[in-house]
Amino acid sequence: MKKLSVFVKDRRKEVRMTQKEFAERAGVALTVVRKIEQGKTNLNLDKVNLVLAMFGHEMAPAASIELESTDEAS
């Protein structure tokens, strides 16, 4: 599975856009595109989806799963 940062950067380069041009077209700040391409993890999902919409994709949060403790001493 491709990392989000690699996917966005590769697709942006395929359409021959600078980060600034791409950000303007996607309707997000330049810093959003930079953070995504740098692999930052503290991103706003709505902003990420504005970027992914440029390629016909969307991201959704994954369900959180709690693991049971196997520690018998507790």
Explain the meaning of each model-derived region.
Residues 46-62:
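DNA major-groove recognition helix of helix-turn-helix/homeodomain DNA-binding modules
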